[in-house]
């Protein structure tokens, strides 16, 4: 919000930004689209009605970060397993929320609401189509795996970032309405 680069970017014609967390984690966190305005809070800069996004990463980055620590996921297969585990948990969380919401007001008074979980709220937002997925993947096989996982859990990938091998699966990306955010 107080970065002097905002005014420099504006001079170059940049009127808005999509700010994402880093790409070391399988599920990195939420992103936000903002207008390039000099304001004191990020909320006052948010682009009207722009959905939040979720940054995810596969392949090299999580493999390197966690592998160097001797932790999982340290392989590409471990990446896929970690995603599937998280999406299964998110489906369960969403199911519990829906079951609770379907109850009458009287029944709700007798039962506790499901415990709030911010990570699961973000993932269920993806499953409900409210949060857009931006996935950091370099390799074509990794992107194809991520598309398979997205289909398995019925969510959409909006964009692959740094997809240097996206050209190898251009038809697959086009068929699934996925764009690439690549280096120039």
Describe the residue ranges of each PLM region.
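Polyanionic/metal-chelating signatures
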Residues: 10-161, 169
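Catalytic core of soluble alpha/beta enzymes
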Residues: 143-144, 164-184
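Aromatic/His-enriched, Gly/Pro-containing loop or helix-boundary segments
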Residues: 1-7
């Amino acid at each position: 919000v107080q970065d002097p680069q905002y005014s420099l970017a504006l001079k170059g014609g940049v009127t808005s930004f999509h700010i994402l967390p880093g790409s070391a984690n399988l599920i990195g966190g939420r992103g936000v689209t903002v207008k390039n305005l000099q304001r004191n809070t990020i909320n006052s800069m948010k682009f009207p009605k722009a959905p939040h996004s979720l940054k995810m990463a596969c392949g090299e980055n999580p493999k390197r970060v966690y592998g160097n620590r001797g932790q999982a996921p340290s392989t590409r297969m471990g990446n896929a397993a970690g995603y599937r585990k998280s999406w299964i948990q998110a489906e369960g969380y969403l199911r519990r929320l829906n079951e609770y919401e379907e109850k009458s007001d009287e029944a709700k008074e007798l039962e506790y609401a499901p415990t709030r979980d911010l990570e699961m709220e973000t993932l269920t937002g993806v499953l409900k189509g409210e949060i857009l997925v931006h996935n950091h993947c370099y390799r074509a096989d990794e992107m194809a795996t991520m598309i398979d996982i997205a289909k398995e859990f019925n969510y959409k990938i909006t964009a692959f970032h740094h997809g240097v091998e996206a050209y190898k699966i251009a038809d697959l990306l086009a068929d699934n309405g996925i764009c690439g955010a690549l280096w120039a």
